[in-house]
Amino acid sequence: MSGAEEAGGGGPAAGPAGSVPAGVGVGAGAGAGVGVGAGPGAAAGPAAAAALGEAAGPGLPDEAGLAGARQLQEAAGDPDAPPKKRLRAAEAAEAAAAAAAAGSGKLEERLYSVLCCTVCLDLPKASVYQCTNGHLMCAGCFIHLLADARLKEEQATCPNCRCEISKSLCCRNLAVEKAVSELPSECGFCLCQFPRSILERHQKEECQDRVTQCKYKRIGCPWHGPFHELTVHEAACAHPTKTGNELMEILDEMDQSHRKEMQLYNSIFSLLSFEKIGYTEVQFRPYRTDDFITRLYYETPRFTVLNQTWVLKARVNDSERNPNLSCKRTLSFQLLLKSKVTAPLECSFLLLKGPYDDVKISPVIYHFVFTNESNETDYVPLPIVDSVECNKLLAAKNINLRLFLFQIQK
């Protein structure tokens, strides 16, 4: 709680001018501070007065500001006070002003806890829903609550007040959505603060530190760097001066990469023609192992796809001992079949980003034959673009992805 809140919205009003010691003037009105006039210690007055005025903000000074003012008045009003005492008093007054300013906290920090989702405790990225009592849920958590209730054959309830929730009982809260879109968020490239509503455009089009590519990448230039260095690089790029034979070798490599990409998408289109296809949104939740040195892992609640019950697990850097000491971060996952099957179940599966997240995942198709004896796949890499995207996932309260399952029938 801030000093202003502890004082009940502000300290008492300043008394008559005659009650103030000689050489000290108390300013009235907004941002009232304490200024030192003539007499010893006057040099310390303006800085402390400005600091105290900022700490107090609009209205009257709070308790911390008044305490600093009293210390400054005592030292300034006593002509016999030693210079060291006057200096210490001035420093104490400025420290009290700084503490009062820090105690109040930024508005956006206080709003964060007010507007966050009651389930994942994170700020919503898309739609915001509320129960009949006004508790907020982001779209991803709202859908998960409904899906979990369907699997348990129960009525979905608000995790706060336990009132019933459904798509017909809950409504969107546009005011909260707009308020969240105006809250400041930090650009991952330049570390500046921008409203969340324009942050994506800033990172893609305006940020001078955003990662960009050379315009000669089509003829093989591999350069990646900040946008403000692009002009200098392109002026010195050697690829435009290469001979035709050199460029043909580069273009052959690019054609091979293009063929692999086309092969992947053709495989996905082929899977989409299968008779039995299932997909669902999955939510990886963080847990800790029971080891002496605990390790982070993720696991989803049980879900049903293709009339079978499944679970997904994930781990960081293949459960290495100290992943926090590594600059490279990776996630790997495995799919577990929890149902009993009467015959081998051959499936292809892949993970993609969920509908309410912006993580960058490249599609990779995995294949496995599930039986009662072999009911879990090996850990396979989650195809995240880079360590930056992995850190974004690890920083979130939960990881929301979409799983596709294709049953191969012989």
UniProtKB/Swiss-Prot annotation:
One of its GO terms (molecular function) is zinc ion binding. Signal peptide: none annotated. Residues 1-22 are annotated as: Disordered. SUPFAM superfamilies: RING/U-box (SSF57850), TRAF domain-like (SSF49599). InterPro entries: Sina-like_RING, ZFTRAF1, Znf_RING, Znf_RING/FYVE/PHD. Belongs to the ZFTRAF1 family. Interacts with LGALS3. This is Zinc finger TRAF-type-containing protein 1. It comes from Bos taurus (Bovine).
